[in-house]
């Protein structure tokens, strides 16, 4: 059995300003840097055998700060930057305020499968997620030793991942899942999954949720998006879609 930590990046400038900024501009805020270091300290005794990050600077920086707090030593090139775990492109809502995007999402009935004009489709997102999962599966299945894998990615991308794992029952058995887990995680919160090796070519692969929305490391449970929802009654219907 191997372990995978799926982590949402720390708070970014865009999160703090409630703006959907271009990836190259959307760096971690001071709060985000602190969150990443706090998570690193929380996981300081975990030795990661493999480390993956989205190519966006807010994810790479989060990964670097997590590893900087570890008691283990890592090579400078330990982080594998993987474009398959980047955030979903939202088409005409790129560069718009989060409030505008949230209202548009509400108008769909809070449908996570919503495809805005010009956006990356759900099918396109799931295709790259499957490519990433196959690479992770190859790592898990190679050799006899347990792997411990860190994956730093994004809130919406993680929602798509959980939906995909739940729906593709011919490929994955997603154990210990609860419906209330299907919410956008706060910044630097994590899911810990236990993953079984495949026996030969047999499918499906078993994955079990060990920790959902892990937040023990956070000094405060306040979150930029939660504040936006709390301060705008017009966004009340989103309270069930985000971790409180």
Name each region found by the language model.
Residues 1-48, 64, 68, 72, ...:
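An N-terminal RHG(E/S)-centered segment typical of histidine phosphatases
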Residues 2, 88-99, 142-145, 163-244:
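Acidic, low-complexity terminal tails and accessory targeting/binding regions
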Residues 3-7, 144-153:
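Beta-strand elements within well-structured catalytic alpha/beta cores of enzymes
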Residues 12, 157-158:
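Short active-site segment of divalent metal-dependent hydrolases/proteases
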Residues 37-109:
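Phosphate-coordination/substrate-recognition cap region in phosphate-metabolizing enzymes
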Residues 45-47, 136-148:
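Glycine-rich phosphate-binding loop signature in dinucleotide/nucleotide-binding domains
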Residues 54-56, 84, 147-156:
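Short, well-ordered beta-to-alpha junction loops that form the rim of enzyme active sites
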Residues 105-124:
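Short glycine/proline- and acidic residue-enriched helix-loop micro-motifs
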